Amino acid sequence: MQYSNYHSHCDFCDGRSFPEDFVKFAIRNGFRAYGFSSHSPLPFETFWNMSKEDMNEYLAEIRRLKEKYADKLEIYCGLEIDFLDKTYNASIPYFQELPLDYRISSIHYLPLQMPLEEENMMCIDGSYDAFKISTEEYYGGDIRKVVRHFYQSSCEMVEAGGFDVVGHLDKIYMNGQRFPGFSLDAEWYKKEFFNCLDLIQEKGLMVEVNTKNYVKKRELFPHQAFLKCLKERNIPVMVNSDCHYPDLVNDGREAAFDFLKDAGYKNTCELVKGVWREVALE
């Protein structure tokens, strides 16, 4: 089995270590390929996104590591790019003109009103307390409205394009499942989720199986209960750890492989000499 990871955060954003530390871990643990995907710049400052001012240094550092470890590991430079709306996403010229090997697109924020500033956003990837307050204040306490907004934004992200991989597709359930009235089994929830899957299938995009929460909570994104639904649509997948610490690079990977096999997958997608290819799940 060939190990690879393409969703990774270092000290250029909210990661907790230098890029080279992740590379060294990957080499020690037999990885064939490793990709960096720092949180992209946003129109506003956050503690977890990198700034545009740091972009050239980020690109240069990953390029340096590519050259230094060329005989030991395939290293790739990507970004995890936030979809905010049709005016700020992976498809805009700024992100398209960057010399990246790949792009992941994810949703962390739901815009509540203009302009695109942090105080006008609902963060779906923060604390439950903040999530609950925003749900009550802006959605009348109706979790269905939040889920609908999330998947509408997800579909707009897929339509906008400009990226290779859908990041943590159903992250809304992380906090949503703690809210009264939410259930992954509910027909209203599955309708929103499946509509998004159908569009991903139509556009031919890859979806990551994100293992970040697996060790602590035994949960994947997309949730393992839905991996068969991806397979039924022949949606290509890869396994990423979304790690922020080097020693967490491999967390949950073997479990994700097992879930994928159970769902009927025979292959995952990997970059091989710069080209996306299917690699056997052995």
For each feature predicted by the language model, list its residue ranges.
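Conserved beta-strand termini and adjacent loop/short-helix elements that scaffold enzyme active sites
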Residues: 78, 210-212, 270-273
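Extended substrate/RNA-proximal surfaces in nucleic-acid metabolism proteins
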Residues: 55-202
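Hydrophobic residues within beta-strands of alpha/beta enzymes
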Residues: 34-36, 103, 166, 207, ...
